[in-house]
């Protein structure tokens, strides 16, 4: 068998080579088998054992449709030092479930899983991988469906290929950290890039929706790339982690697909180099200096307009860690679990600048445990390419579940779109017109020498 460092498993023919227990294949996806029209409550799928080039790191991805009351759990094991490890779980997963990564290790501590990455410290590295996915439901009328499984390893002796030169530029929306939710800090870079990759295909999803749909509850961060790929899969996009060389990147751009790439570089305010995510949107050649360059979207730029940047190819290959996330166009037949958007109205409260959500005439107040993002965007008369390009101004939650607008907006008045994304990625959306304050009446009190108002006194 040819050894490849990136494996992507999808489709009926590929999945049928593994072992299905209480599962069936339906429209190319793994689903729970059924008896008399009722789904079984539990089932599992185990892939064949795959030989891999000796590796030090392993990343696993999955794309699944998991309706309410269903769950997916992906596990892996590694062949190293002449034996297979025990199964290691990446945590139970569903769009509406509080996702938490799990840490585990082998008995000798030489192979361990932390977050989204399995590290093999054993001499000679790992040489084999096997995946397993467990499906479960608490409702025999619904079943989860797994559409894609992927495994990517970083070889110990990686002979990186360059491929053929390519001159192609792709459109990729520009989003920067400073214009979006600051709750996650610099780690908001990955949700920004993932939103851009999907919005390139017309999704129009907010980075904040992506962030809360992929948040790792164990670290309260958005740095888990397995959850990032799963979040994109929820929206119907085939998406997986990969360890790529220049040939792989050029093939993705050649096929018209932008890629999320991890680079190591210095950023403002950081003493040591940090790893951050950028969007790769093309390659080019500068005839003036006879050099190749890459086209990137850097979310750490100061403004949306400064996100597009270029970098010499030799510099990019020095900073590129090899870790990437590939995303392909949405398939029409794929069921989607994209974060819910609830169309609401806003009702003015008794306190100045406080409004309350209503849905279909019923109160839809923000719950006490709300820990998401609330913002509003003014209607500025500009046709923005995506909703995420609008200018967002932060609002706050009141103690009784309302939305408090900042004083400067109340002073300006006008029409606004209001967004409240909760910790599951579900978003309330409403429109409101803030009344413009009445101008202060001109003073009519008599002044010196019989003058009134603001007219100057005559000498």
Q: Where do the protein language model's features map onto the residues?
A:
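Beta-strand-rich ligand- or partner-binding modules
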Residues: 1-169
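Conserved active-site-adjacent core of cysteine acyl-enzyme catalytic domains
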Residues: 38, 209-333, 399
């Amino acid at each position: 068998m040819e050894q490849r460092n990136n494996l992507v498993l999808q489709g009926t023919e590929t999945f049928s080579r593994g072992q299905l227990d209480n599962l069936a294949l339906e429209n190319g996806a793994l689903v729970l088998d059924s008896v008399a029209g009722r789904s079984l409550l539990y089932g599992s799928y185990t892939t064949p054992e795959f030989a891999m080039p000796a590796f030090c790191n392993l990343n696993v991805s999955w794309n699944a449709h998991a309706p309410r009351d269903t769950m997916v759990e992906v596990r892996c094991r590694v062949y190293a030092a002449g034996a297979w490890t025990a199964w290691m779980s990446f945590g139970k997963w569903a769009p509406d479930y509080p996702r938490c990564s799990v840490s585990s290790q082998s008995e000798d501590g030489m192979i361990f899983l932390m977050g989204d990455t399995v590290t093999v410290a054993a001499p000679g590295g790992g040489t084999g991988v096997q995946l397993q996915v467990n499906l479960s439901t608490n409702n025999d009328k619904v079943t989860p469906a797994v559409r894609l499984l992927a495994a990517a390893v970083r070889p110990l002796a990686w002979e990186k290929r360059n491929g053929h030169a390519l001159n192609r530029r792709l459109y990729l929306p520009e989003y920067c950290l400073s214009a979006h939710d600051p709750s996650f800090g610099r780690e908001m870079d990955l949700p920004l890039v993932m939103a851009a990759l999907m919005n390139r295909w017309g999704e129009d999803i907010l980075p904040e929706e992506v962030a809360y749909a992929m948040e790792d509850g164990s670290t309260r961060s958005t740095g888990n790339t397995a959850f990032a790929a799963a979040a994109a899969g929820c929206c119907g996009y085939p998406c997986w982690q990969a360890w790529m060389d220049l040939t792989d990147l050029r093939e993705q751009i050649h096929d018209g697909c932008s890629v999320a790439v991890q680079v190591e570089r210095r950023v403002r305010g950081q003493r040591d180099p940090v790893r951050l995510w950028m969007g790769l949107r093309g390659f080019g050649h500068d005839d003036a200096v006879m050099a190749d360059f890459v086209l990137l979207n850097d979310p750490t730029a100061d403004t949306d307009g400064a996100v597009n940047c270029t970098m010499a190819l030799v510099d990019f290959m020095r900073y590129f860690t090899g870790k990437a996330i590939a995303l392909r166009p949405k398939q029409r037949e794929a069921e989607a679990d994209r974060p819910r958007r609830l169309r609401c109205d806003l009702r003015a409260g008794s306190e100045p600048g406080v409004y309350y959500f209503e849905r279909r005439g019923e109160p839809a107040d923000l719950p006490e445990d709300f820990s998401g993002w609330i913002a509003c965007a003014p209607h500025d008369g500009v046709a923005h390419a995506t909703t995420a390009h609008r200018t967002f101004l932060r609002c706050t939650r009141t103690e009784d579940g309302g939305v408090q607008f900042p004083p400067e907006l109340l002073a300006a008045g006008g029409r606004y779109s209001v967004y409240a994304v909760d910790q599951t990625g579900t978003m309330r959306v409403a429109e409101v017109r803030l009344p413009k304050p009445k101008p202060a009446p001109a003073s009519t009190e008599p002044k010196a020498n019989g003058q009134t108002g603001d007219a100057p006194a005559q000498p």
